[in-house]
Amino acid sequence: MLLSDRDLRAAIESGRVKLDPYDPELVQPSSIDVRLDRYFRVFENHKYPHIDPAVEQPGLTRLVEPEGDEPFILHPGEFVLASTYEMVTLPNDIASRLEGKSSLGRLGLLTHSTAGFIDPGFSGHVTLELSNVSTLPIKLYPGMRIGQLCMFQLSSPAENPYGSEVCGSRYQGQRGPTPSRSYLNFTRTKIREGDQ
């Protein structure tokens, strides 16, 4: 069940859902807007011949912080990591989805590539996967509204929420845009010729 504005406010005011800092003005009819933090991770394309999710690649990204109130310029075709200004904490019976803002999508800004789902039990700043699919650079201002969180009530609390030992949660408590840690639990099924 998708939570309405009144359900979202009740969940936040009771402390079940935490957004820090929380601004009641960000509550929409069925979502909560989130703002862009000031840190970005840019890819160092010259360090590796390719990206390999099976191995650690230190130095694949570099942390960038714009000076003062200066915007970050996202060039056409560029992909960077960023994060929400808000720290988000979900209880064991609420999951969330990050969605982009319509007005920014109409400018060619994609807020996440594929990883918009946030598990129950998660706590941390949500990493954004920003892409510019327009033909012009886009200015990204720290503190601007960058996306929205839709929250869903689970049919029952998760038996093993994010952050539990069973899950091997690699991003619990993350601060700022966190690079991929896929190598920590990379698995691969051997596909043989003639299968199927």
From Swiss-Prot:
Residues flagged as site, Important for bifunctional activity: 116-117
Gene: dcd
Assembly behavior: Homotrimer.
Keyword Hydrolase annotated: yes
Family membership noted in the UniProt record: Belongs to the dCTP deaminase family.
Domain of life: Bacteria
Keywords: Hydrolase, Nucleotide metabolism, Nucleotide-binding
Residues at the catalytic site: 129 (proton donor/acceptor)
Organism taxonomic ancestry: Bacteria, Bacillati, Actinomycetota, Actinomycetes, Streptosporangiales
Pfam families xref list: DCD
Name assigned to this protein: dCTP deaminase, dUMP-forming
Gene Ontology BP terms: dUMP biosynthetic process; dUTP biosynthetic process; nucleobase-containing small molecule interconversion
EC category name: hydrolase
Catalytic activity annotation: dCTP + 2 H2O = dUMP + NH4(+) + diphosphate
Annotated positions binding dCTP: 101-106, 119, 127-129, 148, 162, 174
Segments traversing the membrane: none
Pathway noted in the entry: Pyrimidine metabolism; dUMP biosynthesis; dUMP from dCTP: step 1/1
Gene3D superfamilies for this protein: 2.70.40.10
The EC number(s) this enzyme carries: 3.5.4.30
Function: Bifunctional enzyme that catalyzes both the deamination of dCTP to dUTP and the hydrolysis of dUTP to dUMP without releasing the toxic dUTP intermediate.
Molecular functions per Gene Ontology: dCTP deaminase (dUMP-forming) activity; dCTP deaminase activity; nucleotide binding
